[in-house]
């Protein structure tokens, strides 16, 4: 089969590699679509420490079951359409045993630490596969993984009925978070982004107001602030807009060495709550349901998928901010 092989940071090729066979407890999936996300860019640039090289990246994917190991007892017949949770937890560390699987001390992930889905086929644990409703195509199925991350983020925030929200970043994750906020009953949601086309999409998806800069909102205060940019200065800026008793969700991934200027006195005196959100925690099945029911619609975010041979072009479009969400269709 053909696959993207990243030999070292900055150097990838489309290569012929052996077809995978299902190991114990595994299925083989023909990849229908695999999304490119910020983590893939970090892996390409050598900025994701857990990643070994060479590796085939790709962790946001959906496809068709083509082979099933004999010991698999789940209802995953050949021909079934599935989305795959890429998370690989050990199940025995202190955090896994306390229900915090996403903080596993031995964390691994398909496409991040073991070869993933920028390939025609991939072998995965059967327990990571989620059946898709028949009307969900490959691209929509590949959006389940990022939506599952967003669902976990909002669960971390807690109840938000009627609360005013400012959300920074109208990329893929920001626009999924926006839809979830609206669907969950948040009060008016204001979205901030520098790209006019993305703000237009945000308005169509339910934003009550859009702004091109945090400066436009400097005299306002919000009960909830959500950052989906991962830019430290933006995190500081949006935190400054919190009202007393406000809650901040740091969702975007900042550089590890970045710090915040949020005053400890303000956290104390204004009872500010700062919350992080790491990947997925038992939110994959709810994400399947949200897309399958039509409650969340990722289609306004999607560009036409590109073939494996155009992986480099897809990366260029992601890096230069063209479109919102790009997928590779290897098969």
Give residue spans per PLM region.
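C-terminal hydrophobic helical "lid"/dimerization subdomain
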Residues: 281-331
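A short acidic, Gly/Pro-enriched loop at the edge of an enzyme's catalytic core
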Residues: 217-225
């Amino acid at each position: 089969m053909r696959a993207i092989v990243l030999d070292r940071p900055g150097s990838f090729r489309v290569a012929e590699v052996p077809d995978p066979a299902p190991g114990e407890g595994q299925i083989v999936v023909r990849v229908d679509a695999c999304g490119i996300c910020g983590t893939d860019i970090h892996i390409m640039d050598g900025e994701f420490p857990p990643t070994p090289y060479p590796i085939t990246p790709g962790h946001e994917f959906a496809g068709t079951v083509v082979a099933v190991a004999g010991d698999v007892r789940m209802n995953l017949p050949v021909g079934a359409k599935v989305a795959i949770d890429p998370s690989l937890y050990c199940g025995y560390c202190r955090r896994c045993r306390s229900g915090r699987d996403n903080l596993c001390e031995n964390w691994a992930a398909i496409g991040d630490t073991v070869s993933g889905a920028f390939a025609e086929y991939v072998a995965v644990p059967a327990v990571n596969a989620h059946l898709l409703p028949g009307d969900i195509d490959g691209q929509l199925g590949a959006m389940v993984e990022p939506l599952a991350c967003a669902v976990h983020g909002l669960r971390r925030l807690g109840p938000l009925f009627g609360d005013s929200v400012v959300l920074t970043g109208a990329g893929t994750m920001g626009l999924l978070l926006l839809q979830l906020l609206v669907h969950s009953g948040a009060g008016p949601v204001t979205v901030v982004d520098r790209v006019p086309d993305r703000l237009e999409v945000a308005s169509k998806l339910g934003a009550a107001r859009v702004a091109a800069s945090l400066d436009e909102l400097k005299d306002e205060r919000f009960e909830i602030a959500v950052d989906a940019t991962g830019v430290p200065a933006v995190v500081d800026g949006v935190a400054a807009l919190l009202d007393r008793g406000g809650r901040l969700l740091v969702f975007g991934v900042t550089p590890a060495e970045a710090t915040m200027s949020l005053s400890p006195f303000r956290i104390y005196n204004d009872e500010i709550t700062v919350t992080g959100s790491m990947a997925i925690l038992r939110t994959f099945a709810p994400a399947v349901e949200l897309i399958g029911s039509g409650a969340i619609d990722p289609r306004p975010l999607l560009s036409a998928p590109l073939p494996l041979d155009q992986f480099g072009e897809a990366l260029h479009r992601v890096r230069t901010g063209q479109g919102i969400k790009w997928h590779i269709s290897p098969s």
